[in-house]
Amino acid sequence: MTIELGIAPIGWTNDDMPELGKEVTFEQAIDEMTLAGYKGTEVGNKYPKDPKTLKHFLDLRHLKIASAWFSAFLTTKPYEETEAAFIKHRDFLHAMGAKVIVVAEQGHSVQGLLDKSVFDDKPHFTDDEWERLATGLERLGDRAREVGMQIVYHHHMGTGVQTTAEIDRLMTMTDPDKVSLLFDTGHLVLSGEDPLTIFNRYQDRIKHIHFKDVRQQQADEEHKDHLSFLAGVKNGMFTVPGDGMIDFKPIWEAIQESGYDGWIIVEAEQDPAKANPFEYALKAKKYLDATMNIPQSA
């Protein structure tokens, strides 16, 4: 079992709301990731788009790229449009040495809409849309396998694959050899799901992990005030492991027992003006080191 610990840049600068962290440079973010002791990162909106340039900056800091988000529109657009964008994304990540590609369906998604409740207004796919999603993901999985990579599907708040039932349906409808799963603690808990149930059920298909924590008060407000996903982020509903309501110890024990081999990425969308990203990166690293002693490769 080889597990590497990385951190997402979304705590430094937000992809969905670029005004959050707009003053933070790419180099500041990766410098602080390195100083905090992480071995890798996912790709953010300020990262160089040229693999050679990006690799140069990361190699200086002994950082690696674990993956990067890809927005699919398989339920609402012709498959060919998604595939063309996916191939470019795949080739970039392949050049960076990543093994998995994070994919999330954005057809009908409300995650980027400030005026839509993440619970009340989330999409519910029709049977035809489910078929299009499953078939399209398997085709993308085939394209990933052409270069020795895998797609990992990201269940996400405000999308058509958020709940346990929706995750179950997607996993049932897709070939395990073509479609793997990203396990995100924060999105599961905020949605009201049991992360241990999901992990134990799909441990053989989980190929990428996000460790995100949730603040109880802000999670309650997300429901009570019918907030959007972005409003919830601004309100501070997410934080790093050890700073919220999630008990990561049993989750870590299940991960160890499963023989998981891959990345664990610390991820917490927060306003860096309110939650200093370097301080929170250190806080998460200290908590994970003290409570889980994650073994890492050299």
Curated annotation (Swiss-Prot):
Q: Which GO terms describe its biological process?
A: inositol catabolic process
For this protein, the record's SUPFAM superfamilies field holds:
Xylose isomerase-like
Which pathway does UniProt place it in? Polyol metabolism; myo-inositol degradation into acetyl-CoA; acetyl-CoA from myo-inositol: step 2/7
Specify whether Plastid is a keyword of the entry. no
Give the top-rank taxon of the lineage listed in the UniProt record for this protein: Bacteria
Gene3D superfamilies in the cross-refs? Divalent-metal-dependent TIM barrel enzymes
Q: Manganese: present as a keyword of the record?
A: yes
Catalytic reaction equation(s): scyllo-inosose = 3D-3,5/4-trihydroxycyclohexane-1,2-dione + H2O
The GO molecular function terms of this record are: manganese ion binding; myo-inosose-2 dehydratase activity
Task: Tell me which cofactor or cofactors this protein depends on.
Answer: glutathione; Co(2+); Mn(2+)
Q: What is its EC number?
A: 4.2.1.44
Keyword terms of this UniProt record: Cobalt, Lyase, Manganese
Q: Which enzyme type, at the first EC level?
A: lyase
Hey, which family's this protein in?
Answer: Belongs to the IolE/MocC family.
> Which NCBIfam families does this UniProt record tie to the protein?
myo_inos_iolE
Which PANTHER family would you find in this protein's record?
HYDROXYPYRUVATE ISOMERASE, INOSOSE DEHYDRATASE
Q: What is this protein called?
A: Inosose dehydratase
